[in-house]
């Protein structure tokens, strides 16, 4: 699910847009737009089946039958079902209001709170392949309509020239003539218009304005204080001078998880706000100075799970951006949050117990960083293999395969080569040549990203991705590579 919109005139009516609009290489594809009219008891499919990613839904506050949808569209290919769509009959039929080209979708959509006929649409030209990402192109731009989407004008006065990437647009609820645009460009920055988008002034080009725009393109004016602006990103930033200077919002404790993607401030009392992060949902009752974690939402994502041979057996798993964990499979009072024990940090991936010594646990985080931990003594040892003087740099996948052979009790890890350890990771031997395609065109991560480079191990390619030792013959080993 990429976006949710509640009909403020009929709160039991909720619109859901599917598909992830934050376009990493692991995003999910949606199946269109859905609606419930009974508070979520039943949902009805309302169309846009080929949209793949819906970034925003806006219900006209003066007429609930009028709904606007920002369709970001396909990530991996051209597609025609993208742009700005509108229904005037509650979703029975749809018309496309704004379209640029097959590689450009609508990544952000905003409505003037005082005039529902005025809309701002941020169009984004982008494409991802299996080995590369391009943010930006001739299709990107910011558009405005004053007649409910029937006609559009491209806005440019004061906005950066050259190649534009992703844009986030927002209109101040307390000062509707003030419009904000977070623009990815050669020097990404926050821009502000005080004349309804006719002219723009650069407010801030702090580094945080350009941090991973495909992942953190979000700007949120406070609904009560005209000069207070929030910028979610790696952390939540706030400006109290209309967007000139940003600093961390949390100043008095109550930490929250990093990577903030969703944000809401109550228009009735702006002390109350909600923050969606890689660690779940947080709530603040003091403008973000302190935060409380909503611990009753089971929204963690496991990469891998395993079990040991204890009685009762234990379950091990690695969580997306939330470390590695261990818990018993049964408990007289049932399994509770308190039964889970943390064993590792970072993005947790493979986590499993040693077959011959149950006190030893192996866990890893991104890029092949593997550890062996002793649960009795608390000792942690970093056991990742490194290249020697005769070997080029190793290419480890974001989700590096680590395997414990059932037949041999040997440990395996894959980069572009396969490594084996017969002493629980204390030493390693390389037992293969390069098993990947070793295609240099698929190893240019430093050039990937388009307007903004995105050089992280999340995009490492031509690597070993999975390993299995035969359960019958330890000399037979299978690997999967690209």
Task: Give the predicted meaning of each segment.
Residues 1-482:
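Beta-propeller blade termini and top-face loops
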């Amino acid at each position: 699910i990429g976006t949710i919109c509640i009909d403020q005139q009929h709160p039991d009516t909720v619109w859901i847009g599917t598909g992830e609009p934050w376009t990493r290489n692991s995003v999910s594809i949606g199946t269109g737009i859905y609606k419930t009219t009974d508070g979520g008891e039943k949902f009805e499919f309302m169309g846009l089946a080929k949209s793949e990613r819906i970034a925003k839904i806006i219900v006209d506050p003066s007429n609930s039958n009028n709904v606007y949808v920002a369709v970001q569209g396909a990530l991996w290919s051209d597609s025609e079902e993208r742009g700005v769509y509108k229904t005037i009959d509650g979703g029975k039929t749809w018309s496309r209001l704004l379209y640029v080209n097959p590689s450009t979708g609508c990544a952000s959509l905003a409505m003037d709170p005082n005039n529902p006929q005025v809309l701002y649409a941020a169009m984004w030209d982008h494409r991802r392949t299996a080995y590369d990402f391009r943010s930006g192109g001739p299709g990107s731009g910011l558009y405005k309509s004053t007649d409910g989407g029937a006609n559009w004008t491209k806005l440019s006065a004061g906005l950066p020239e050259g190649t534009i990437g992703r844009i986030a647009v927002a209109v101040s609820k307390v000062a509707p003539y003030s419009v904000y645009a977070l623009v990815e460009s050669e020097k990404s920055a926050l821009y502000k218009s005080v004349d309804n988008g006719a002219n723009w002034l650069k407010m801030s080009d702090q580094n945080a304005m350009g941090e991973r725009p495909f992942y953190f393109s979000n700007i949120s004016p406070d609904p009560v204080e005209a000069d207070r602006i929030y910028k979610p990103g790696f952390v939540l930033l706030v400006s109290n001078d209309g967007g000139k200077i940003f600093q961390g919002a949390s100043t008095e404790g109550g930490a929250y998880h990093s990577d903030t993607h969703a944000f809401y401030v109550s228009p009735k009392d702006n002390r109350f706000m909600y923050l969606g992060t890689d660690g779940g949902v947080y709530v603040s009752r003091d403008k973000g100075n302190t935060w409380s974690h909503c611990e009753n939402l089971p929204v963690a994502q496991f990469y891998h799970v395993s079990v040991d041979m204890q009685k009762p057996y234990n379950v091990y798993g690695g969580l997306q951006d939330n470390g590695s964990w261990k818990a018993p499979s049964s408990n007289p009072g049932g399994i509770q949050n308190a039964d889970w024990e943390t064993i590792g940090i970072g993005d947790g991936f493979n986590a499993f117990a040693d077959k011959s010594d149950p006190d030893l646990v192996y866990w890893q985080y991104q890029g092949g960083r593997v550890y062996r931990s002793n649960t009795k003594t608390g000792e942690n040892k970093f056991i990742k293999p490194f290249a020697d003087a005769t070997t080029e740099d190793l290419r480890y996948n974001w989700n590096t395969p680590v395997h414990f052979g059932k037949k041999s009790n040997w440990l395996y890890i894959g980069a572009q080569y396969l490594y084996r350890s017969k002493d629980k990771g204390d030493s390693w031997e390389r037992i293969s040549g390069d098993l990947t395609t070793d295609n240099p065109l698929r190893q240019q991560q430093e050039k990937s990203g388009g307007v903004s480079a995105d050089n992280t191990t999340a995009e490492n390619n031509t690597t070993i991705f999975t390993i299995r030792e035969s359960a019958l013959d330890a000399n037979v080993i299978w690997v999967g590579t690209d």
